[in-house]
UniProtKB/Swiss-Prot annotation:
CDD domains: Cadherin_repeat (cd11304). GO terms for molecular function: calcium ion binding. GO terms for cellular component: cell-cell contact zone; extracellular region; plasma membrane. The gene is PCDHA10. Residues 29-695 are extracellular. Residues 783-804, 827-948 are annotated as: Disordered. Pfam families: Cadherin, Cadherin_2, Cadherin_tail. It is a single-pass type I membrane protein. This is Protocadherin alpha-10. GO terms for biological process: aorta development; aortic valve development; cell adhesion; embryonic placenta development; gene expression; homophilic cell adhesion via plasma membrane adhesion molecules; nervous system development.
Length: 948
C-alpha cells in the first residue's frame, strides 16, 4: 500500500514538472538556479540547447546576454552554449533580506531578431552567523515587578534567508527568568524574558545571563550576547500605551515635519514617577531614525527625511516610554507605518537592437527595433502603455510584458519620404498620468524601383548640312527619382541600320552627359531626316531604362552650283549652235538654256542673265529671267552680225549664290540659206523654220514612223498600268500619275529620286491628292510620256474640290513662293497666300521689263505653282485658276497641269530633268511662206513640261 502511494506521488510530481516546463516554453522564459558564492565557471544550464538554437549559428546570429544591473555575473560560452558563473555572486549583496532572489537575463539573437527571457534563481547558503548589535544588554528591573512580567530583548539578525535565517534562542540556566519567543509579522522572532521568581535586590542586586541564537543552516552557526540585569528599588507602576501596536497609513513623498502619529501613554504612579519621556527603542535601526524623529515630551512622531515607496513601503518603529521614577519604569509599543504609492516616477523607455536602415521594399511586418518600458511605481501607477507617432507606416506590437516590437505596417517609398523620426511615448496609468518619450530615427534605404524619365518622349532637331565632324547637335537629359547608384543615368544609342550603314556611323551620344554628336558631315541631298532612339539606363540591379525618339532634320545649304544640261545642239557645258532666220520678228524664241541645281528651295531657284561677249555691243537678244529662253528683242536687220556669241549666266538664290555659264552661238541666215545651213547645223534648229521643197514621200515616211511610235508608247503605257507596283522597305518609290481633266492634263514624272527612311515601317511614296470632282485617270509609269484623255472634258472647266488639303508632312520646313510671269500677284490673306494664275501661255511675247517667272532650275515654269510649308491651308483657286503644275516639297516630283488647245504642240525639248537626261524629240512642221509662219508663231505656244 505504501509502495503504491509512493508511485502515485512520483507520477504527480513528474506531471507537475512537465506542466511547468510546458508553461515555461509557452511563455518564452527559462528558469535556472545557482547557489551563491559559486566558483567561476560553475555550470548553470545549457541555454542554447534549451532555447532550441544551433551551436553553429550562435556567432552568426550575434548571440548575446544582457542584464540591466548584473550583466557580468553570468556569461555564455558561445562554443558549447553553456551558461556559467562569471564572477562572485553574493546573495545578500544582490537581494538583501528578500526571500526571492533572481537574476533576470535577456538573450538576444539577430537574423531574425529574437529575444528570450531567462531567470536565474540565486539560492542561499548558510554563510552568515547570527549577530547581535551589542555584546552586552543591560536591563534595569525593579524588584517590585510581578511574576510573569515580560522584558523584551534585542534579538539577533542573520543575513541569510529561509532556513538559514530561522533563529532559535537559548537562555543560560537560572532560577529567575525563562525565555519566551514572539513571532513578528515578517516571520522574524525576538526573545522576551519572563519573570518566574520575584526579585530581591538585597539578595541579588544583579544577574548575569547568556542569550545564544542558533540559525537553521547546515552546518549551524551561533551568536550570543551577555545580559546584565540590574535589580532596582521599587517604582511599582510602569507607563502603559493605549495599545501595544499602532498602524498608520500615509502617502509617500511627505514633506519634513509632517506628523505621523501622536502616542499616548499613562502611569499610575504619582509625582516624579508619573512623568514620562518617549524615545525610540534600541531596536530601531539607524535608517528609520534618519527618516523619523520623536518628540520625547509629547510623543509625536514626525517625518524627518524623504520617504519613498520605491525604497521601502513599510516601517516598523519600536517606541519606549520611561517614567522618572527611581528606578524608572519603561513601557513599550510598536508603530507600523505603511506608505501608499504615488505616481511620482515617469516611465523609462529603452530602444535596443535597431535593424537600420530599412529597405523601401521591406515586407510588411518586418521588425525594425525592440522597445522595453518600465516604471518604478506599483499598481496602476506602474502599468505602462506605449504609443507611436501617428500617420507613419509603422506600429508597435506587444510581444511580452513591457516589451514591444516596432514593425513595418505599410509599404515604404523612399522617393516620397526618405527618413522617419518616430517618437515612442510611454504613459503610465496614474492620475495624472506621467509619460516619457524616446526618438527612433528610421532611414529608408533606396531600391531601384524608378526608371529614368525624359521630359518629352520625342524631340525634333534642325541641323544644317555640311556640319563639322563631331558637331554637338543636341543634349538629352533624363531624371531618375532613385538615389545614389540607382540614379546614375547613362545614355546610349538604340542601334539599327540605315540602308547599308549603321546608325552609329552617323551619330553618337555621350554616356554621361547625354550630348548627341554628328560623327560626320550630313548631306541634305543624301539624307533629309535622321530618326533614331536614345536609351537611358540607370545603375541599379537590375537596371531600368526608357527611350527617347530624336528626329534630326538636315537643312539644306547652298553647296551645289547650277549644272548645265546637255541639249541636242551641243554637249553639256559646251557651246550651243543655233540658226536663226533674219526674217524673225521680235519675241521669237531662238534657244533655251537648261540647268539644274541639286539643292532645294531657294538654293535651287535658278535665274538667267545674258552677258555681252563684246563690250558695248548691241545684242538683239534677251533671256528669260527664270525660263532660260533666249528670244529676239526686235526684228533682225542687215546691221546685225551674222554670228552672235551669247554668254548666259545661270545663278541660284542661295547665300552666297553659285553660278554657271552657258555659251550659245547664234548664226543669222537668210531664208534661201536655211536648207544648206540646216544640213550643217545641229538638230537644235527652232521648229518654226519652214522646210521648203520637202519630198512628199519624206512626209509620208515621217508620219508612218510617228504613228508607229505613238502605238508603241500606248502599248507600253497599258502594260505598265496593268503591272502592280512593288515597294520595299526603305527602297525607292515611283509615284506615278497622269490625269486628264477639264483644264488639261496632269503629268507626274520622276528623275531624281530621294527618300527619307526612318527605319520604322515601309517608305512612304510621294503623296498626291486630287479633287474627287475630276474624272478618273489612268496610271502610267514615271518614265513614260505624258498622256491626256480627250473628249468633252477638255472643253468644260470645273471648280476644284475645296476638300483638297495639304498633307501634314508638307507643312514642316522650308517654303517657296508662287512666281507668276507677267501678271503674277502674291497676296496675303487670312488663310495664307492667294495665288492668281496667269491666262497667258509661255508663247506670249514677253515685255521688255524684267520677268517674274519661277525658278526653272527648281523645276517650275512660268505657269506653275508650288506648295507652301506653313501652318495654314492655302486658299483654293477659283474656276479657271487651277495651276498648271505644282511641286511636292522634299521630293523631286513635279505635277504638271496644263490646259492645251486642241491644235497645240508639245515641245519635247522643253522637258527638264534633275540628274538624268531625258530624250528630247522635236517635231518639225513644214509651212510655206514667211507670212504663214509668222501667223502660226502668234497663234501657237510651246508648252514646257517639267520633270524632276
Amino acid at each position: 500500500m505504501v509502495s503504491r502511494c509512493s508511485c502515485l506521488g512520483v507520477q504527480c510530481l513528474l506531471l507537475s514538472l512537465l506542466l511547468l516546463a510546458a508553461w515555461e516554453v509557452g511563455s518564452g522564459q527559462l528558469h535556472y538556479s545557482v547557489y551563491e558564492e559559486a566558483r567561476h565557471g560553475t555550470f548553470v544550464g545549457r541555454i542554447a540547447q534549451d532555447l532550441g538554437l544551433e551551436l553553429a549559428e550562435l556567432v552568426q546570429r550575434l548571440f548575446r546576454v544582457a542584464s540591466k544591473r548584473h550583466g557580468d555575473l553570468l556569461e555564455v560560452n558561445l562554443q558549447n552554449g553553456i551558461l556559467f558563473v562569471n564572477s562572485r555572486i553574493d546573495r545578500e549583496e544582490l537581494c538583501g533580506r528578500s526571500v526571492e532572489c533572481s537574476i533576470h537575463l535577456e538573450v538576444i539573437v539577430d537574423r531574425p531578431l529574437q529575444v528570450f527571457h531567462v531567470d536565474v534563481e540565486v539560492k542561499d547558503i548558510n554563510d552568515n552567523p547570527p549577530r547581535f548589535s551589542v555584546t552586552e544588554q543591560k536591563l534595569s528591573i525593579p524588584e517590585s515587578r510581578l511574576l510573569d512580567s515580560r522584558f523584551p530583548l534585542e534579538g539577533a539578525s542573520d543575513a541569510d534567508v529561509g532556513e538559514n535565517a530561522l533563529l532559535t534562542y537559548k537562555l543560560s540556566p537560572n532560577e529567575y527568568f525563562v525565555l519566551d519567543i514572539i513571532n513578528k509579522k515578517d516571520k522574524d522572532k525576538f526573545p522576551v524574558l519572563v519573570l518566574r521568581k520575584l526579585l530581591d535586590r538585597e539578595e541579588n542586586p544583579q544577574l548575569k545571563l547568556l542569550l545564544t541564537a542558533t540559525d537553521g543552516g547546515k552546518p549551524e552557526f551561533t551568536g550570543s550576547v551577555s545580559l546584565l540585569i540590574l535589580v532596582l528599588d521599587a517604582n511599582d507602576n510602569a507607563p502603559i500605551f493605549d495599545r501595544p501596536v499602532y498602524e498608520v497609513k500615509m502617502y509617500e513623498n511627505q514633506v519634513n515635519q509632517t506628523l505621523v502619529i501622536r502616542l499616548n501613554a499613562s502611569d499610575s504612579d504619582e509625582g516624579i514617577n508619573k512623568e514620562m519621556m518617549y524615545s525610540f527603542s534600541s531596536l530601531v535601526p539607524p535608517t528609520i531614525r534618519r527618516k523619523f524623529w520623536i518628540n520625547e515630551r509629547t510623543g509625536e512622531i514626525k517625518v524627518n527625511d524623504a520617504i519613498d515607496f520605491e525604497d521601502s513601503n513599510t516601517y516598523e518603529i519600536h517606541v519606549d516610554v520611561t517614567d522618572k521614577g527611581n528606578p524608572p519604569m519603561v513601557g513599550h509599543c510598536t508603530v507600523l507605518v505603511e506608505l501608499l504609492d504615488e505616481n511620482d516616477n515617469s516611465p523609462e523607455v529603452i530602444v535596443t537592437s535597431l535593424s537600420l536602415p530599412v529597405k523601401e521594399d521591406a515586407q510588411v511586418g518586418t521588425v525594425i527595433a525592440l522597445i522595453s518600458v518600465s516604471d518604478h511605481d506599483s499598481g496602476a501607477n506602474g502599468q505602462v502603455t506605449c504609443s507611436l507617432t501617428p500617420h507613419v507606416p509603422f506600429k508597435l506590437v506587444s510581444t511580452y510584458k513591457n516589451y514591444y516590437s516596432l514593425v513595418l505596417d505599410s509599404a515604404l517609398d523612399r522617393e516620397r519620404v526618405s527618413a522617419y523620426e518616430l517618437v515612442v511615448t510611454a504613459r503610465d496609468g496614474g492620475s495624472p498620468p506621467l509619460w516619457a518619450t524616446a526618438s527612433v530615427s528610421v532611414e529608408v534605404a533606396d531600391v531601384n524601383d524608378n526608371a529614368p524619365a525624359f521630359a518629352q518622349s520625342e524631340y525634333t532637331v534642325f541641323v544644317k548640312e555640311n556640319n563639322p565632324p563631331g558637331c554637338h547637335i543636341f543634349t538629352v537629359s533624363a531624371w531618375d527619382a532613385d538615389a545614389q547608384e540607382n540614379a546614375l543615368v547613362s545614355y546610349s544609342l538604340v542601334e539599327r541600320r540605315l540602308g547599308e550603314r549603321s546608325l552609329s556611323s552617323y551619330v553618337s551620344v555621350h554616356a554621361e552627359s547625354g550630348k548627341v554628336y554628328a560623327l560626320q558631315p550630313l548631306d541634305h541631298e543624301e539624307l533629309e531626316l535622321l530618326q533614331f532612339q536614345v536609351s537611358a539606363r540607370d545603375g541599379g540591379v537590375p537596371p531600368l531604362g526608357s527611350n527617347l525618339t530624336l528626329q534630326v532634320f538636315v537643312l539644306d545649304e547652298n553647296d551645289n552650283a547650277p549644272a548645265l544640261l546637255a541639249s541636242p545642239a551641243g554637249s553639256a557645258g559646251g557651246a550651243v549652235s543655233e540658226l536663226v532666220l533674219r526674217s524673225v520678228v521680235a519675241g521669237h524664241v531662238v534657244a533655251k538654256v537648261r540647268a539644274v541645281d541639286a539643292d532645294s528651295g531657294y538654293n535651287a531657284w535658278l535665274s538667267y542673265e545674258l552677258q555681252s561677249a563684246a563690250v558695248g555691243a548691241r545684242i538683239p537678244f534677251r533671256v528669260g529671267l527664270y525660263t532660260g529662253e533666249i528670244s529676239t528683242t526686235r526684228a533682225l536687220d542687215e546691221t546685225d552680225s551674222p554670228r552672235q556669241r551669247l554668254l548666259v549666266l545661270v545663278k541660284d538664290h542661295g547665300e552666297p549664290s553659285l553660278t554657271a555659264t552657258a555659251t550659245v552661238l547664234v548664226s543669222l541666215v537668210e531664208g534661201s540659206q536655211a536648207p544648206k545651213a540646216s544640213s550643217r547645223a545641229s538638230v537644235g534648229v527652232a521648229p518654226e523654220v519652214a522646210l521648203v521643197d520637202v519630198n512628199v514621200y519624206l512626209i509620208i515616211a515621217i508620219c508612218a514612223v510617228s504613228s508607229l511610235l505613238v502605238l508603241t508608247l500606248l502599248l507600253y503605257t497599258a502594260l505598265r498600268c496593268s503591272a502592280a507596283p512593288t515597294e520595299g522597305a526603305c527602297g525607292p518609290v515611283k509615284p506615278t500619275l497622269v490625269c486628264s481633266s477639264a483644264v488639261g492634263s496632269w503629268s507626274y514624272s520622276q528623275q531624281r529620286r530621294q527618300r527619307v527612311c526612318s527605319g520604322e515601317g515601309l517608305p512612304k511614296a510621294d503623296l498626291m491628292a486630287f479633287s474627287p470632282s475630276l474624272p478618273p485617270c489612268p496610271m502610267v509609269d514615271v518614265d513614260g510620256e505624258d498622256q491626256s484623255i480627250g473628249g468633252d472634258h477638255s472643253r468644260k472647266p470645273r471648280q476644284p474640290n475645296p476638300d483638297w488639303r495639304y498633307s501634314a508632312s508638307l507643312r514642316a520646313g522650308m517654303h517657296s513662293s508662287v512666281h507668276l510671269e507677267e501678271a503674277g500677284i502674291l497676296r496675303a490673306g487670312p488663310g495664307g497666300p492667294d495665288q492668281q494664275w496667269p491666262t497667258v501661255s509661255s508663247a506670249t511675247p514677253e515685255p521688255e521689263a524684267g520677268e517674274v517667272s519661277p525658278p526653272v532650275g527648281a523645276g517650275v515654269n512660268s505657269n506653275s505653282w508650288t506648295f507652301k510649308y506653313g501652318p495654314g491651308n492655302p486658299k483654293q483657286s477659283g474656276p479657271g485658276e487651277l495651276p498648271d503644275k505644282f511641286i511636292i516639297p522634299g521630293s523631286p516630283a513635279i505635277i504638271s497641269i496644263r490646259q492645251e488647245p486642241t491644235n497645240s504642240q508639245i515641245d519635247k525639248s522643253d522637258f527638264i530633268t534633275f540628274g538624268k537626261k531625258e530624250e528630247t524629240k522635236k517635231k518639225k512642221k513644214k509651212k510655206k511662206g514667211n507670212k504663214t509662219q509668222e501667223k502660226k508663231e502668234k497663234g501657237n505656244s510651246t508648252t514646257d513640261n517639267s520633270d524632276q
